[in-house]
Regions:
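Hydrophobic alpha-helical segments
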Residues: 1-181
Length: 181
């Protein structure tokens, strides 16, 4: 049961309305998470700006794989449903690739290095080793790319924490519990 309300269209603060309307138009419906997040125009619009900027980072398969890995570590079932859906339908990842990403890996070596690094960042709270940095650099990522990976980890963690705190009603397909994959 949700611990906050998902706003109805007439309840959305005026400063959140353009952002929420754009998401609704783009997605085709208003996810409960966004309808709740819109209660705070400052937080909602800041997150939306970060999301817009980070949608240009790396490639969609890598971004979605990182989202899956981070959401798995953070135990966010809402976000795992969202990222599993987008990974399948937008990034065109196979079911096996989605499970692998949730475990912090990928089939393609360069993407695997990014996902493993993101997994290390979230597990160690950023206290990665020199060897971790060397591995991701050796895979072909620049320091700018590594900063983007870190920003993606932070962005996905924000929505993980938001959804874990407020426990929104799921409006994306449920995923298999992590213990059984």
């Amino acid at each position: 049961m949700s611990r906050t309300i998902a706003l109805k269209p007439e309840q959305v603060p005026v400063d959140s309305k353009p952002t929420l309307d754009a998401f609704t138009k783009n997605i085709g419906f208003t996810p409960n998470m966004m309808a709740a997040f819109a209660q705070s125009p400052l937080a909602f619009n800041a997150w939306a700006t970060l999301l817009g900027s980070m949608s240009k980072a790396l490639d969609v398969k890598t971004r979605d794989s990182i989202g899956l890995a981070v959401s798995e570590v953070n135990g966010c079932n809402y976000c795992l449903g969202v990222h599993s859906f987008t990974a399948e339908h937008m990034a065109k990842l196979s079911a096996d690739d989605i499970i692998l990403a949730r475990k912090g890996h990928a089939t393609e070596p360069k993407r695997d290095a990014a996902v493993q690094f993101a997994h290390k960042v979230i597990e160690t709270r950023g206290q990665v080793s020199d060897a971790d940095l060397k591995t991701v650099r050796d895979a072909g990522y620049t320091d700018a790319n590594i900063m983007e990976i870190i920003a993606l980890v932070a962005m996905y963690s924000l929505t993980n924490f938001f959804n874990n705190v407020f426990d929104h009603e799921k409006d994306f397909p449920a995923v298999t519990p992590a213990g059984s994959i």
